[in-house]
């Protein structure tokens, strides 16, 4: 077991009850193009077209053969583009339940499939896009093979669902998915789970189980990769979400594309935080209708630390998100707030009274409690960074745009979510995730 000592479990109110309920009927779903790093789409449909679930909507020009398929049947109601015609979203108005059938196999045949068969099946169904590389967090190039594959069967994000509750309902499909993944690598398939949890064991010795304990980010796949299979420019691993492993298992044994998604709807502005069964790319306005407290709320696809805020073109459940978080928009001004004791404000430092109430849960809002200023190294970053990385030095070099030094300090091991806690505790209010992405893109382009 690997024990994580550094980190932070955010004391936020509104944790979900770990019970699964059916969510409301969803009338619009979307694929969000900006979730796929470096992807350039070649559109295969246009507005007004009728599509079936599993039908290809667009192909990646940079990776021919990588198809992005419809998560539901219906009509293409909008194709939204941003600056320089960057694809933002493809919106589908859900109608009926027609779907593309796929070839399927008996459970005992899965272990005999070739890697070419598995890759072809994943590519044509669109489930290949559930895989991501580390470094760079991109969709893998068809034909490539990773040193290992990681599945995080634990989640330490604030307000997250317990993955074991979800996996327990589909344990057979989960194990079938693991069998399929073993055909894609000569290395290990690492299943990482929380210490003390009962996990259904796979009989294939290629599948290994690793226990992690401690505060967030103990549940992040970046943490697991760092301790088990550190990456570099010459060593690449893949990772995939546990619900996508279930979908892969169902694809190969049933011949259908499963786009179900169980998410935690939680946060201080949710009336009854709970786990909801919905569908991939679901409209957030439809998913949260009638379930929120009155007021000006911010709906976030994903975690409050690293998720994506609701907007007109991004108001849908993200491909890689397992939760929907809702907090209050902090638009009001506070007179002399900087001299108040701050009983209801949380801080990692001893600057507010809230710091001393260890068991208190706080109704966090979007307030930043101050403006941007110079980066101040007072030890906050080191307190929440469990990886063997010089946090302050790395963050400084990221802000300075020093790619050589950032690479030497370990930035290739990181994704935006790995620096979310550094952003949260930063006295200078810097957003380190986008800065990291710019540096990674530059490193990749320069080779």
UniProtKB/Swiss-Prot annotation:
<comment type="subunit">
    <text>Composed of six subunits; NqrA, NqrB, NqrC, NqrD, NqrE and NqrF.</text>
</comment>
<dbReference type="InterPro" id="IPR022615">
    <property type="entry name" value="NqrA_C_domain"/>
</dbReference>
<comment type="similarity">
    <text>Belongs to the NqrA family.</text>
</comment>
<dbReference type="Pfam" id="PF11973">
    <property type="entry name" value="NQRA_SLBB"/>
</dbReference>
<keyword id="KW-0830">Ubiquinone</keyword>
<dbReference type="InterPro" id="IPR008703">
    <property type="entry name" value="NqrA"/>
</dbReference>
<keyword id="KW-1278">Translocase</keyword>
<dbReference type="InterPro" id="IPR056147">
    <property type="entry name" value="NQRA_N"/>
</dbReference>
<keyword id="KW-0915">Sodium</keyword>
<dbReference type="Pfam" id="PF24836">
    <property type="entry name" value="NQRA_2nd"/>
</dbReference>
<dbReference type="Pfam" id="PF05896">
    <property type="entry name" value="NQRA_N"/>
</dbReference>
<keyword id="KW-0739">Sodium transport</keyword>
<comment type="function">
    <text>NQR complex catalyzes the reduction of ubiquinone-1 to ubiquinol by two successive reactions, coupled with the transport of Na(+) ions from the cytoplasm to the periplasm. NqrA to NqrE are probably involved in the second step, the conversion of ubisemiquinone to ubiquinol.</text>
</comment>
<keyword id="KW-0406">Ion transport</keyword>
<dbReference type="InterPro" id="IPR056148">
    <property type="entry name" value="NQRA_2nd"/>
</dbReference>
<dbReference type="GO" id="GO:0016655">
    <property type="term" value="F:oxidoreductase activity, acting on NAD(P)H, quinone or similar compound as acceptor"/>
</dbReference>
<keyword id="KW-0813">Transport</keyword>
<keyword id="KW-0520">NAD</keyword>
<protein>
    <recommendedName>
        <fullName>Na(+)-translocating NADH-quinone reductase subunit A</fullName>
        <ecNumber>7.2.1.1</ecNumber>
    </recommendedName>
</protein>
<dbReference type="GO" id="GO:0006814">
    <property type="term" value="P:sodium ion transport"/>
</dbReference>
């Amino acid at each position: 077991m690997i024990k994580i000592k550094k980190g932070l479990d955010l004391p936020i109110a509104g944790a979900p009850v770990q019970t699964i309920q059916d969510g409301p009927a969803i009338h619009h779903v979307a694929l969000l193009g900006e979730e796929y790093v470096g992807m350039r789409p070649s559109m295969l449909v246009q507005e007004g077209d009728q599509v079936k679930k599993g039908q290809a909507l667009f192909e990646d020009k940079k990776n021919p053969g990588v198809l992005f398929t419809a998560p539901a049947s219906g009509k293409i109601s909008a194709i939204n583009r941003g600056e320089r015609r960057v694809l933002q979203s493809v919106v589908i108005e859900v109608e009926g339940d027609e779907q593309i059938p796929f070839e399927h196999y008996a459970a005992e045949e899965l272990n005999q499939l070739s890697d070419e068969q598995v890759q072809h099946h994943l590519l044509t169904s669109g489930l290949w896009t559930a895989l991501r590389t580390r470094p760079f967090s991109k969709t893998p190039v068809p034909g490539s093979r990773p040193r290992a594959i990681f599945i995080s069967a634990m989640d330490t994000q604030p307000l997250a669902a317990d993955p074991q509750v979800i996996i327990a309902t589909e344990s057979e499909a989960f194990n079938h998915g693991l069998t399929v993944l073993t055909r894609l690598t000569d290395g290990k398939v690492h299943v990482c789970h929380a210490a003390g949890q009962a996990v259904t064991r796979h009989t294939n010795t290629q599948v290994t189980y690793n226990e992690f304990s401690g505060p967030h980010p103990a549940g992040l796949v970046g943490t697991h990769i760092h301790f088990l299979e550190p990456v570099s420019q010459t060593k690449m691993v893949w990772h995939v979400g546990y619900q996508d492993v279930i979908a892969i298992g169902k694809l190969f044994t049933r011949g259908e594309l499963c786009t179900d998604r169980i998410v935690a709807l939680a946060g201080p502005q949710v009336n009854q935080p709970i786990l909801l069964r919905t569908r991939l790319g679901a409209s957030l306005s439809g998913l949260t209708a009638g379930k929120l407290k009155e007021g000006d709320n911010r709906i976030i696809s994903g975690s409050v630390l690293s998720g994506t805020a609701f907007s007109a073109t991004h108001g849908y459940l993200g491909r890689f998100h397992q939760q929907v978080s809702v907090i209050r928009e902090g638009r009001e001004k506070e007179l002399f707030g900087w001299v108040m004791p701050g009983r209801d404000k949380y801080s990692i430092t001893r600057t507010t009274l809230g710091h001393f109430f260890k068991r208190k849960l706080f109704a966090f809002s979007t307030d930043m409690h101050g403006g941007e200023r110079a980066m101040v190294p007072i030890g906050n970053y080191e307190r929440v960074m469990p990886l063997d990385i010089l946090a302050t030095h790395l963050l400084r070099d990221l802000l300075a745009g020093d790619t050589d030094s950032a690479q030497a300090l370990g930035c290739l091991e990181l994704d935006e979510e790995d620096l979310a806690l550094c952003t949260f505790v930063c006295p200078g209010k810097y957003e380190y995730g986008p800065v990291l992405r710019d540096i990674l893109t530059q490193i990749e382009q320069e080779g």
